[in-house]
Every structure is written in C-alpha cells, then in structure tokens.
Curated annotation (Swiss-Prot):
GO cellular component terms, A-Z: chromatin; nucleoplasm; nucleus; plasma membrane; RNA polymerase II transcription regulator complex
Alphabetical UniProt keywords: Activator, Disease variant, DNA-binding, Isopeptide bond, Nucleus, Phosphoprotein, Transcription, Transcription regulation, Ubl conjugation
Region (Leucine-zipper): 230-237
Ranges for domain bZIP: 204-267
One of the GO BP terms on file: cellular response to lipopolysaccharide
Reported effect, R219H: In IMD108; gain-of-function variant resulting in increased DNA-binding transcription factor activity and decreased association with transcriptional repressors
Gene from which the chain derives: CEBPE
InterPro entries documented for this protein: bZIP (IPR004827), bZIP_sf (IPR046347), C/EBP (IPR031106), C/EBP_chordates (IPR016468)
Self-association and partners: Binds DNA as a homodimer and as a heterodimer. Can form stable heterodimers with CEBPA, CEBPB and CEBPD. Interacts with GATA1 and SPI1. Interacts with SMARCD2.
UniProt similarity note: Belongs to the bZIP family. C/EBP subfamily.
Subcellular localization: Nucleus
Full protein name: CCAAT/enhancer-binding protein epsilon
Expression tissues: Strongest expression occurs in promyelocyte and late-myeloblast-like cell lines.
Segments of this protein annotated with the region Disordered: 1-30
Length: 281
C-alpha cells in the first residue's frame, strides 16, 4: 500500500545526482544516499492490545552476560533453568495403586513431573468409588502448566490440584450421560409382542374359534374360485358350440346362393329358346 508521504519523489534543491564510479565508495558516500528518505509511522496500524504485547516483548533487554561478558560462574542463558546434575535414569516400574516407590531418578522428586505416570484404570468397588472418581479426576495438562516457568496462564479453579494421585476411575456404564440430541436416543427394548396385539393362549377356546373361522373363510374363498372356474369353462364350451352352428349355417347359405345364381344365369337362354320356337310355328 503506497502513500505519498512515505518517500520524496522530487530531488531537493542543490542535491547532486548520484554517480557510480569504478572504485569502491567510501562510508561517507554510502551514508549520504539515505538522507532524503522519511521514516514510516506504524502507530496508527497497531491496536492497543498489540502495542501492549510489543512493549512486553521488547522490554526485556539482553543482559551483558548473554553477549559474552559473563563471569566464571554465571550461566550463559539466565532465562533457562539450570540442568539437573543427577543422572538421567528411569525409576523401576511399580504397579501399586498410589505409585509411592518411584526410586532414585530425575523424576523421583516430589515437585517434578513423571511422564510415565499414565492414567491407571481401576474398577470402582461400590457406589462410593464412582462418586470419588468424578471428584478426583485429574488433568495432566494442569500439572504441566503449573511447573512451566516461562508460561503465565490463568487456570480455572475447577481443575484438580497437582498433588492428587494420577488415577482415573472408570465409572460404570449405568451412570453414563444420555445423548444430547433427541435423534440419538437409544432404541427402546422390543417386547415379545408388538403394540396392539394381545397374547392369546393357543389352548384357549377363543383361539380355536378364531382358527375355525379363518379356516371356514379360506374354504369359502377356494370354493368360490372353483365355481368361477367351472362357470368360465362352461361358457367357453357353449360359445364353441354356438360358433360351430353359425359356421354350418354360413356354409348352407353359401350353397343356396350359388344355386340361385346358376338359375338366374339360365333364365335368358330359356327365353330365347321360347321365342325361337314361337317364330317357327
């Protein structure tokens, strides 16, 4: 993003243009090159929160020891924790409930963090054990942040104190929280019979009467279907007989028509014969 007040485009009066010579320029000439540049003010682009953050970051100045001016007994990096002179060794494994015997090592001190102290699953021994598990749940993140010297955070008071043992008791499944969404509700256990049907004893009189009525209805429907089939077959036979009669009638009428046509063809010849016989007489 460019601005007109950042740099001066026009040369000032009396300013000579830069000339590049073959030799190396001295320190005085290099210093004169940047005299006409203006500084940029970034205070308008920095918010109040960011300004406070920058002031906190740049307020710490390096000590003279950090620049190499340290004494014989002063550490090179004063902001870091001194190394532990004890040897780095893991303590022997202990499987007790309280993990009291950690053994000699770098993590055996009371104020140090043990990375091997993972959550130990213990089954509750009664209703009191499940309630103690909900009260004594421990967050390892709280323990790490509390022992970090370079981090400053405001932790909620609801978290457990770092002095509590690293144990997480698993609550029974019966005390699990219900699902939040109504669509994720657990299906209700299905009963032996669906809703709307009552249990009927097969040896009862009502069940026998119902089965008898169903059997009678099935037999009636089957008899009705058989009667319809027989009626259809009978109609088919009647139609076939009527078709045969009609065919015979058509053949008879065709023969009569042919006979009549032959008679009409012979009538003019007979008339001519009669006329010829009458003229001869």
């Amino acid at each position: 993003m460019s601005h007109g007040t950042y740099y001066e485009c026009e040369p000032r009066g009396g300013q000579q243009p830069l000339e590049f010579s073959g030799g190396r320029a001295g320190p005085g000439e290099l210093g004169d090159m940047c005299e006409h540049e203006a500084s940029i003010d970034l205070s308008a682009y920095i918010e109040s929160g960011e300004e406070q953050l920058l002031s906190d970051l740049f307020a710490v100045k390096p000590a003279p020891e950090a620049r190499g001016l340290k004494g014989p007994g002063t550490p090179a990096f004063p902001h870091y924790l001194p190394p532990d002179p004890r040897p780095f060794a893991y303590p022997p494994h202990t499987f007790g409930p309280d993990r009291k015997a950690l053994g000699p090592g770098i993590y055996s001190s009371p104020g140090s963090y043990d990375p091997r102290a993972v959550a130990v699953k213990e089954e509750p021994r009664g209703p009191e054990g499940s309630r103690a598990a909900s009260r004594g749940s421990y967050n390892p993140l709280q323990y790490q942040v509390a022992h970090c010297g370079q981090t400053a955070m405001h932790l909620p008071p609801t978290l457990a104190a770092p002095g509590q043992p690293l144990r997480v008791l698993k609550a029974p499944l019966a005390t699990a929280a219900p699902p939040c969404s109504p669509l994720l509700k657990a299906p209700s256990p299905a009963g032996p019979l669906h809703k709307g049907k009552k249990a009927v004893n097969k040896d009862s009189l009502e069940y026998r009467l119902r089965r008898e009525r169903n059997n009678i209805a099935v037999r009636k429907s089957r008899d009705k279907a058989k009667r319809r089939i027989l009626e259809t077959q009978q109609k088919v036979l009647e139609y076939m007989a009527e078709n045969e009669r009609l065919r015979s009638r058509v053949e008879q009428l065709t023969q009569e028509l042919d006979t009549l046509r032959n008679l009409f063809r012979q009538i003019p010849e007979a008339a001519n014969l009669i006329k010829g016989v009458g003229g001869c007489s």
